[in-house]
Amino acid sequence: MSLFKDKTLMITGGTGSFGNAVLNRFLKTDIGEIRIFSRDEKKQDDMRHEFQAKMPEVAEKIKFSIGDVRDIASVKNAMHGVDYIFHAAALKQVPSCEFFPIEAVKTNVLGTENVLTAAIEAGVKNIVCLSTDKAAYPVNAMGTSKAMMEKVIVAKSRTVSPDKTKICCTRYGNVMCSRGSVIPLWIEQIRQGNPITLTDPKMTRFIMSLDEAVDLVLFAFEHGESGDILVQKAPACTIQTQAEAVCELFGGSKENIKVIGIRHGEKMYETLLTNEECANAIDMGNFYRVPCDKRGLNYDKYFNKGDAERNTLTEFNSNNTKLLTVEETKEKIASLEYIKEELAK
């Protein structure tokens, strides 16, 4: 963690699952301060008490700032002395964003613009923004707002020297057991003896753990260049496979799985990299890096000289990546701290 020694890291939307995972990873390192910026004072108070109880010797490194990314004044007030930012604040529930799309725009697009503007003015050195696979070929309001967020990031990266402020972006698949995800719901349904509800058994989703989510952000922080999009080469599984794995872990009946149909704005499979992005992607082992297109608006000079031959990869989606079996999915789910705690109850 030497890159973070004595530095101040700000996490927007920091009381969520990602913020908690970062605190668990960083608090016992040589980092100077972790600043949690969010709008919910109750969640901040809960987080404060939780970490004072379980890590009293380092909990003083956590500082809290109440505000909303929609309000640039509150963002600027929280930005003083910040070295690095992980921008996780977002509206991310697909159905609710379908019914309130302008709210998704206010938080995910305009809120990101506010964070980046304030960060550049404050001289923040490195910003990693969290996006989603739903931003690739978006069909719903949440994905569309995140796609626009990515465009804001790329546009902002062109306006500032990377020596002053580096801005890059990560795309996630489904982060298992994060707030609002389906596995905690299934566990509760099993315990109450209710049917396990799933949308479509053939639907596929990328899956990753919270630790892997943090790993991706740290990889982007260290290896990404300004304007880049970085993704993990994540495996996937069908929703049926995931539901059966949870049933086996928690004693539910596979016969009690109820198909309720696809919700507003959902797709049968998700895409982490489009065809066009794959053509430019750089293979970095467990990750792909998609460089920013640095060309300006003066296209005349490009008419006489085309691109070099491109890669011929197809898009990277949850149907053509490694599909896990029930046993492999169960093993991955069982390794999560949340699941270990639930199984111990």
Go through the PLM ranges and name each one.
Residues 7-29:
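N-terminal Rossmann NAD(P)H-binding glycine-rich loop of SDR-like oxidoreductase domains
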Residues 30-43:
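Conserved glycine-rich Rossmann-like NAD(P)H-binding loop of the short-chain dehydrogenase/reductase
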Residues 38, 65-66, 106, 200, ...:
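Conserved residues in the N-terminal Rossmann fold of short-chain dehydrogenase/reductase
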Residues 115, 121, 151, 155-177, ...:
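Strand-loop microenvironment adjacent to phosphate/nucleotide-handling motifs in alpha/beta enzyme folds
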